[in-house]
């Protein structure tokens, strides 16, 4: 709805579209169709409304075209007669040329939604109709296994906003310029696994998957309290009305020939953008979470930028103002959350996380247990006795570094080679926040998921109360019993 209102400028001036592509992974019975209906029906309604206007314009076009053909035919007859009779034809030829210049042009069709279609048909539709499209499927398998992905380069270029040359054998070739395409594909996990086996490497190598925001919501089938569909609430109605409004504005901008606005960031947001981009670049290094998902990591900051633009366009009536720091931070948190979904379900567990899990298991085996959830260990001992991969210095250092960044491992104050693993994060960092929150960007399954400070404090108080209760309880040794036999 927003993709033709504005583009977004990086702090360095590079401009990108606001178009987004989402891949939603959900099993049968997870109400993919209901989600599609709630959030895409406003687009369908605007499309139907505009296509109703198209019929009237098409009728007017056919009427004017018929009149034009009649007039041109008469001039053509006159030209043939003059030629046959040897009379001068300059005036008639000029009149014929003028008629050709005023030939009625067919109105553009307001098709917005494209389902299972070939890349050529998609490009042709965006060229002949509105250069504004939405590739949609509530069963993404038909798209991935059908004709739409015969040429992922075209869809990649549309996402990037590049000009596209389409060469056709039967019809004239054309160049599609400045078009905008968003996509929303829903697919079942089993179908996605088949697609990954058949085409996964190719779709990642071409950067096709990397352009998508991948969402894998937890399953709800079998856990709902009601079988009926909930009616849209007031918030949903307002959301749908905003979609209609923004889409109509986008179409109106196209029909008036107006240029898209260029959204920029505020100065604080620009500084934050640079910091976030630097953080992501670090994660592309050999010990980073994106090292084995470089396709995704390289596109992540662009998707964050696009989402910040969409949020700004959607939430603000005066959307020509600058994107704020809060909007950019929200877009970052959202993208990083779903980045985990991409890694878990498209890429698989990063090697650094696998090594970190192995290191935790090795520490439990070969370290010295202290208390309920602490292990003291010496780095060289772990290196000597752990699995082969952890015997390499680089692998061990990277895995150990990741655990230290989560706050669960700290170096001993008494020896540089001695460390302590804390399974309870409160015991390790107290009220401080760790650099990396387990379960957010990385998920080390051998350690607890990060909990906010308030929850850690509450759990710590409960543990203290439980210990105090045990200390204050009288010993049952020597208890005279309940009085039986006395």
Predicted regions and their residues:
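Phosphate-handling catalytic cores of nucleic-acid transaction enzymes
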Residues: 1-486
